[in-house]
Regions:
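Generic alpha-helical scaffold signal
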Residues: 62, 83, 120-123, 127, ...
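Oxidoreductase cofactor-interface core, primarily capturing Rossmann-like NAD(P)-dependent enzymes
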Residues: 2-59, 74-76, 95-106, 113-119, ...
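Alpha-helical repeat scaffolds in large eukaryotic proteins
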Residues: 87, 134, 154-156
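Short-chain dehydrogenase/reductase
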Residues: 126, 130, 175-178
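Fungal eukaryote-biased detector of long internal structured cores
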Residues: 78, 121, 128-144
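Conserved Rossmann-fold cofactor-binding substructure of NAD(P)-dependent oxidoreductases
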Residues: 53-88
Length: 233
């Protein structure tokens, strides 16, 4: 029997939206898309979950053999049939699309307004995903693994020192909610992808020093080691 993986984030809308704003170009690279493409190459049935099956990116994924299913992360009832029958579910939630859609307006209110707004949206959508999967697991029992792309909570780990890192704290809050669902949590794995290497080429153009050397600067403590593994997405 060929197994099925359902992938949220298959069209990479969050990456394309930001890229379009800053460079007026779109990209087909995304975390969800890379997962879908990999499992497709392994012979799995891949179900791509997206808001619009008629978008150009959704059509491009469908042309590869990915089954595109429409669902709304703001509506648990639309997610349940999208997850039904899947053996594996991969989900990445989106902080940045609502951020760039609302920042020009909300940043005039306060320096926290946009972050708080997007935090609330992402957390609720993450909880909707968890609730829908929990429902499918209880009714069908066929789910083998749920993989959630998350991040550590800055506020918690800094003991309240850093409170502005909303895009980390939102995913950490979703993870906390997931852990409260005992049966689902026992079948869950967490993936921490703190930074996409593809963003380097998109937002920090590199200057070539030699044939193999492209310096890239990040501000870190001098005592801090910051190893980076390049993964093709």
């Amino acid at each position: 029997m060929t197994k099925t993986i359902a992938v949220i984030g298959v069209t990479g809308a969050q990456v394309r939206y930001l890229s379009a704003l800053l460079t007026d170009k779109h990209t087909e690279r995304s975390q969800g898309g890379s997962v879908a493409n990999k499992f497709l190459s392994l012979g799995w049935n891949v179900r791509g979950i997206t808001r619009s099956a008629t978008s150009d990116s959704a059509k491009a994924q469908a042309a590869k053999g990915i089954s595109i299913v429409e669902a709304d992360l703001d509506s648990t009832s639309t997610l349940i049939p999208a997850f039904s029958g899947a053996h594996v579910i991969f989900a990445v939630t989106d902080f940045w699309q609502p951020f760039w859609e609302s920042n020009a307006r909300l940043s005039k209110i306060s320096d926290r307004a946009t972050g708080e707004h997007c935090y609330a949206i992402e957390v609720q959508r993450g909880k909707n995903i968890v609730d829908a999967i929990q429902r499918v697991l209880k009714e069908e029992g066929t789910l083998e693994r749920f993989i959630f792309s998350t991040l550590p909570g800055f506020k918690e780990q800094s003991k309240g020192k850093y409170t502005y890192v909303y895009h980390f704290d939102s995913k950490a809050e979703i993870t906390k909610y997931l852990k409260s669902k005992d049966e689902l949590w026992s079948r869950s794995s967490l993936l921490n992808m703190t930074f996409y290497s593809s963003n380097i080429m998109r937002f920090w153009p590199l200057t070539k020093v030699s044939r193999l050397l492209f310096p890239l600067g990040f501000v870190v403590d001098r005592c801090c080691y910051s190893p980076r593994t390049v993964i093709d997405t």
